[in-house]
């Protein structure tokens, strides 16, 4: 029997490996997520992707005290607690993870048509709530990612709900299909739909570094890098593509995490750009701007922490 268009499954002691033509994915049970995303021998992950809830506070946020009201989400953004992992290979639902010694029953010639692995996380907030991230991998290597945030009464207001991907090196640029320029829920009126290219990873030069670079209602995104952490690799461009699933997604692509921006009080305090920080967001709080000394963001641009949110996208 030929397995030319199937996934090879490697049941490791603490990981699940999925291999196909020109790709290899590694899911870590210990770290609670996708540990390696290797396509055409190029690694795309520097850290395990995690739920993200924080954006660097803006002048408006500080003026109306939103940073203090939402501060629990900063800790939840920095520290992730994975509570449960669910695995389904083709039609087989595993009652327990196939780690040692259970994985001894499998050979090194295990194949499947599709795999679903779900990671459950508990937020380090009071009260705590749950987030579920599902990875659906088909036999072409395409990964459909679904994130579900479970709302709970009593939680503080949210800055953002999304996933954060940190890549090993800085991107040379990105192309996207969506709205022109930097957009937010309350900053979309002047944007035009189209296809756009951005050189490098630009950061808006505010006097005090803060949230910037969001792109709303995006249909497709291509991130291009030319370097890796392997000194033996010659520089040449390679790309990762993301596409909308059921609905357009929102994204930012910067050289810094929200925490790095938050910690800097002047631009020169930011570190040298070494990584690519991609945030795919299902919900984004508006930035406001009625004034900078007390006016809140208009209510329709808030994220309700008591409401469920779900978004999805495709990656290949």
UniProtKB/Swiss-Prot annotation:
<comment type="function">
    <text>Component of a beta-galactosidase.</text>
</comment>
<dbReference type="GO" id="GO:0030246">
    <property type="term" value="F:carbohydrate binding"/>
</dbReference>
<dbReference type="InterPro" id="IPR011013">
    <property type="entry name" value="Gal_mutarotase_sf_dom"/>
</dbReference>
<dbReference type="GO" id="GO:0004565">
    <property type="term" value="F:beta-galactosidase activity"/>
</dbReference>
<keyword id="KW-0378">Hydrolase</keyword>
<comment type="similarity">
    <text>Belongs to the bacterial beta-galactosidase small subunit family.</text>
</comment>
<dbReference type="InterPro" id="IPR014718">
    <property type="entry name" value="GH-type_carb-bd"/>
</dbReference>
<dbReference type="Pfam" id="PF02929">
    <property type="entry name" value="Bgal_small_N"/>
</dbReference>
<comment type="subunit">
    <text>Heterodimer of a large (LacL) and a small subunit (LacM).</text>
</comment>
<dbReference type="GO" id="GO:0009341">
    <property type="term" value="C:beta-galactosidase complex"/>
</dbReference>
<dbReference type="GO" id="GO:0005990">
    <property type="term" value="P:lactose catabolic process"/>
</dbReference>
<dbReference type="InterPro" id="IPR050347">
    <property type="entry name" value="Bact_Beta-galactosidase"/>
</dbReference>
<keyword id="KW-0326">Glycosidase</keyword>
<protein>
    <recommendedName>
        <fullName>Beta-galactosidase small subunit</fullName>
        <ecNumber>3.2.1.23</ecNumber>
    </recommendedName>
</protein>
<dbReference type="InterPro" id="IPR004199">
    <property type="entry name" value="B-gal_small/dom_5"/>
</dbReference>
């Amino acid at each position: 029997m030929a397995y030319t268009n199937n996934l090879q499954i490697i049941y490791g002691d603490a990981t699940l490996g999925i291999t196909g033509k020109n790709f290899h994915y590694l899911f870590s049970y210990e770290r609670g997520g996708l540990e390696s995303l290797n396509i055409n021998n190029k690694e795309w992950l520097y850290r395990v992707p995690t739920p993200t809830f924080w954006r660097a506070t803006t002048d408006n946020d500080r003026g109306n005290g939103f940073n203090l009201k939402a501060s629990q989400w900063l800790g939840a953004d920095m520290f992730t607690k994975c509570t449960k992992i669910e695995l389904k290979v083709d039609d087989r639902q595993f009652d327990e993870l196939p780690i040692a010694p259970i994985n001894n029953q499998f050979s090194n010639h295990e194949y499947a048509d599709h795999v679903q692995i779900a990671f459950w996380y508990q937020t380090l907030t009071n009260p705590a709530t749950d987030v579920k991230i599902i990875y659906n991998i088909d036999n072409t290597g395409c990964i459909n990612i679904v994130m579900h945030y479970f709302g709970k009464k009593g939680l503080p207001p949210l800055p953002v709900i999304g996933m954060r991907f940190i890549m090993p090196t800085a991107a040379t640029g990105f192309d996207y299909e969506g709205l022109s320029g930097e957009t937010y829920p309350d900053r979309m009126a002047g944007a035009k739909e189209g296809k756009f290219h951005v050189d490098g990873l630009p950061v808006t030069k505010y006097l005090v570094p803060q949230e910037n670079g969001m792109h709303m209602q995006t249909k497709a995104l291509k991130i291009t890098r030319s370097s890796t952490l392997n000194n033996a690799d010659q520089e040449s461009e390679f790309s990762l593509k993301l596409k909308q699933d059921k609905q357009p997604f929102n994204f930012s692509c910067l050289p810094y995490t929200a925490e790095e921006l938050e910690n800097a009080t002047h631009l020169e305090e930011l570190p040298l750009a070494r990584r690519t920080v991609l945030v795919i967001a299902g919900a984004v709080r508006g930035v406001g701007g009625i004034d900078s000394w007390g006016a809140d963001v208009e209510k329709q641009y808030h994220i309700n922490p008591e409401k469920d949110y779900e978004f999805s996208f495709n990656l290949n």
